[in-house]
Amino acid sequence: AILISNVSAEELTDIQISSPIMDKATISNEAIEEIDTRNAVDGGDLLKNINGVNAIRRGGHGLEAVIRGQSDARLNTFLDGAMVYGACSTKMDPASTYANVNNYDSVTVIKGTQSVLFGAGGPGGIVSFKRVTNPVTKPEYSIGQNFDSNAGAYTTSGNIVLPLSSSSYLRLNGSSSNAGNYETGAGIKPLTEYSTTDYTVILGTLLSDGSKLEFNYSNNRQDKVGYPGLRMDIAYSYTDMYTMKYHKVTPFGIFSSLNFELFNTDIDHLMDNTTLRGTTGNGSMFTPTSSDTYGGRLIGKIGSSMRAGLDYEHNTKNAEQNMTMMGSNVFMAYLWPDVEAE
C-alpha cells in the first residue's frame, strides 16, 4: 500500500484570451488587373497570388484554391453572383476554374467564417468574382493577347460595352485559351494541354430612381483538359450561368437600400481515359457527371452598417462510372446518385 501524508492544492490564476473580430488581413477585395500574376489560366491560378491563398495543381488547368487548409465545397465560390459547385467527382473542375480572369473586374476573398452575406457553410472562406458595368455615352472596348512559350499557351480576350440609351447598356466579353504539353528539363512532356472558350452577355439599365437592374448570361466550354497525375482527363465540361440582379438605392420600409439576386448554373462534365490518351481497349473508362445549382438572396441595409436578409440555394449532382469490357459499355457504380443539397 502507498500512503500519502501531505496533500495540498494550488490556486491557479485566470487565463484571458482576446482576439479582434476581424482585421484587414481577413478580407481582400482587389481589382484583378492589379494582382501580381503572370498569365493566370483560371480563377484558381489567380487566387494563389493573394496573400493567404494556396492552390493545388493537378494539371495545366483547373487549379484548386485552398484557404486555411480548406478547399472544394468548404469554400463558397460565386461568379458574378451565381453560386457554383464543380461537377467532377475527382475535383478536376473546382468552381474557380470556370472564372476566366480576363472577363472579370474584381475578386473578393474572405478568409474563414467571417460573414454570412454569402450563404451558409463555407468554413474555409468566400471567393467572389465580380463584373462591374455602368452606362456609357460611347462604345468602349479592349482586346488582349497573352502567350507562354513553354507550353505554347495563348489566350485571346475581348470586351466591349455599348450604350443602348442614356441609361441602358449592353456588355459583351469573351476569351479563348489553348495550351499544349509543356516540356520539362529532362525532355518529358506531361499531359497538361487544355482548350477553353467562354463568353458573357450583360444587359442592364438604370431606373428613374437610380436603382439598377441587370441580366447576365455566361457560357464556358472546356475541352481536352489533361491531368497527368489522375487516371482520367476532361473530355469536355460545359457550363451555362444565368443571373438577375436588382439593386434598389432608395429607402424601402426600414431598409435604406436593397439587393435582390437570382441565379442558375448548369454544368455537364465528362471525364475519360481515351480522348487524350488513345484507345486503351478493355481498360477504357468514362464518367459523365453534372452539377446544377439555383437560388437567390435578398439583403437589405439598415442604417450605415447593419444588414438583414435571406438566401436560398439548391444543388443537384449526378455521376456514374462506366467501363468498356469485351467491346461493350458496362455500368460500374453511381458516384453521385442524384445527390441533393440545400
Task: Describe the residue ranges of each PLM region.
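Face-selective signature of the C-terminal outer-membrane beta-barrel domain
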Residues: 206-220, 239-342
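Structural signature of outer-membrane beta-barrel domains
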Residues: 22-24, 72, 84, 132, ...
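N-terminal periplasmic "start-of-domain" segments of outer-membrane beta-barrel proteins
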Residues: 12-44, 64, 72
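Hydrophobic, lipid-facing positions within transmembrane beta-strands of outer-membrane proteins
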Residues: 63, 123-125, 139-141, 154-158, ...
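N-terminal periplasmic accessory domains that precede
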Residues: 34, 43-46, 63-66, 78, ...
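Extracytoplasmic beta-strand/coil segments of soluble accessory domains associated
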Residues: 44-83
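Short acidic/polar hinge/loop motifs at secondary-structure boundaries
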Residues: 55, 83-111
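Periplasmic-side early beta-strands and strand-to-turn transitions of outer-membrane beta-barrels
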Residues: 128, 136-138, 144, 155-237
